[in-house]
């Protein structure tokens, strides 16, 4: 998590438009709480975070000007080393237009999280998040 966080922050500092979408409705509450733990550092650095409101979202997209990677790969140890997950590299401009349209629609139906909102989350959740962080590499 720290390597990914650091990479996102460094990209933002280089002027990259970095936005993150996470599910508002989780499949596992403890995973949502662990994910939410990292919002603060990202938000403080100007990275915009959104929660997808219509339901659960599991897709992952990295979108650049001339290419994209689309898949369902979780950014964690288990997905990279224990599971056989994958994504596809897209560089076809026509298909990229479809990815961009889907991307824009996903942001349209997502709710942006502010730093103030994150900072003022319930104390009980904050305590639980600090506890769960210890186990984050195992989940």
Predicted regions and their residues:
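PLD/PLD-like phosphodiesterase catalytic module centered on the HKD motif
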Residues: 1-139
């Amino acid at each position: 998590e720290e390597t990914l966080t650091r990479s996102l922050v460094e990209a933002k500092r280089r002027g990259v438009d970095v936005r993150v979408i996470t599910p508002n409705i989780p499949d596992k509450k403890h995973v949502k709480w662990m994910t939410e733990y990292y919002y603060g550092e990202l938000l403080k650095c100007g990275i915009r975070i959104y929660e997808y409101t219509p339901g659960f979202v599991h897709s992952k997209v990295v979108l650049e000007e001339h290419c994209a990677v689309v898949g369902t790969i979780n950014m964690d140890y288990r997905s990279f080393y224990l599971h056989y997950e994958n994504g596809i590299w897209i560089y076809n401009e026509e298909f990229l237009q479809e990815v961009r349209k889907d991307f824009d629609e996903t942001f349209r139906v997502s709710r942006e999280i502010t730093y103030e909102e994150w900072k003022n989350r319930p104390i009980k959740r904050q305590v639980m998040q600090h506890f769960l962080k210890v186990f984050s590499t195992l989940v």
